[in-house]
Every structure is written in structure tokens, then in C-alpha cells.
């Protein structure tokens, strides 16, 4: 179970150091193997390989009228391995798709992660908060 936000930096080669609190879980759950793909909200999704296989099967089973969504998620997916320093390489294509340059935010989302350009994430978070809580959360007690 992944949760929490981490402000990180991509190096000149597009490598990102995975926070140590996640490395052990990724090694145990997926032998350090992850899959990275594009998300239409403007971020990247990072899945431990076993979770990716579950997600991939759901996407592959979508009806024909969702073929573009299959292309978005499956056609842009790249398998990567944690290196010996605990980093993953984010491909130039995926960095460009999500507008990632140097400063990024890694968000634990339960079974997977989202990777955002830090400025984009801050702007979208502020916009969401300005809109107020959605109906589904109005009766939710904290």
C-alpha cells in the first residue's frame, strides 16, 4: 500500500530516485520491476509489475469503443527496473507527455503511484480545492 507525497528531482538522464520507504516494498512485491504509463490527467502512472498486470487486463477487456483508452494506457507503457541505486529511468517520451522536467511529485495512490510535474500538480491541487468538495465527500466525516 503506497501513500504519501514526495518532492523529488529528475536527473539530467531522466532518472528518479525512489524514496527508500517504497523501495523495500517494490523489491518484495515486484522484484524492483515497475511499469510506467501515461494518464490523461497529465501525469504518469507507476505500477509495481503485479499491479500493472491486473490493470492491463482490465484495460485490455474494455469494449471496442474505448480503443483510444487502450492506446493511451497500453501503447505508452514502458517496463523499467529499479537500478542498484534505487532509481528508475523515465523515458523521454513519457517525460514529454507529462511535462516533466526536473522538479516532480510522486504520490502514493494505494496500489500504484502518480508522477506529476511539481508546478502542474500544485496548480491542479489548488484548482480542485478552490472548487470545493465534491458531493461524494460532503457527508464524509474526517
From Swiss-Prot:
A Pfam match: MraZ
InterPro entries xref list: MraZ (IPR003444), MraZ_C (IPR035644), MraZ_dom (IPR020603), MraZ_N (IPR035642), MraZ_sf (IPR038619), SpoVT-AbrB_dom (IPR007159), SpoVT-AbrB_sf (IPR037914)
GO biological process: negative regulation of DNA-templated transcription initiation
Coiled coil: none
Source species, domain of life: Bacteria
Keywords, ordered alphabetically: Cytoplasm, DNA-binding, Repeat, Transcription, Transcription regulation
CC annotations in GO: cytoplasm; nucleoid
Keyword Cytoplasm included in the entry's annotation: yes
Locations listed in the record: Cytoplasm, Nucleoid
One Gene Ontology molecular-function label: transcription cis-regulatory region binding
Keyword check for NAD: no
Location of the SpoVT-AbrB domain: 5-51, 77-120
Family: Belongs to the MraZ family.
PANTHER family: TRANSCRIPTIONAL REGULATOR MRAZ
Complexes and interactors: Forms oligomers.
Record-given protein name: Transcriptional regulator MraZ
Source organism of the structure: Burkholderia mallei (strain ATCC 23344)
Amino acid at each position: 500500500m503506497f501513500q504519501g507525497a514526495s518532492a523529488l528531482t529528475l536527473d539530467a538522464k531522466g532518472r528518479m530516485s525512489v524514496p527508500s520507504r517504497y523501495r523495500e516494498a517494490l523489491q518484495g512485491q515486484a522484484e524492483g520491476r515497475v511499469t510506467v504509463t501515461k494518464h490523461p490527467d497529465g501525469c504518469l502512472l507507476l505500477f509495481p509489475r503485479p499491479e500493472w498486470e491486473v490493470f492491463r487486463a482490465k484495460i485490455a477487456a474494455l469494449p471496442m469503443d474505448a480503443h483510444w483508452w487502450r492506446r493511451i494506457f497500453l501503447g505508452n507503457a514502458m517496463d523499467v527496473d529499479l537500478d542498484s541505486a534505487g532509481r528508475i529511468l523515465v523515458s523521454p517520451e513519457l517525460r514529454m507527455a507529462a511535462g516533466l522536467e526536473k522538479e516532480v511529485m510522486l504520490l502514493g495512490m494505494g496500489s500504484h503511484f502518480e508522477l506529476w510535474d511539481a508546478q502542474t500538480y500544485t496548480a491542479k491541487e489548488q484548482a480542485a480545492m478552490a472548487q470545493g468538495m465534491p458531493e461524494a465527500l460532503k457527508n464524509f466525516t474526517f
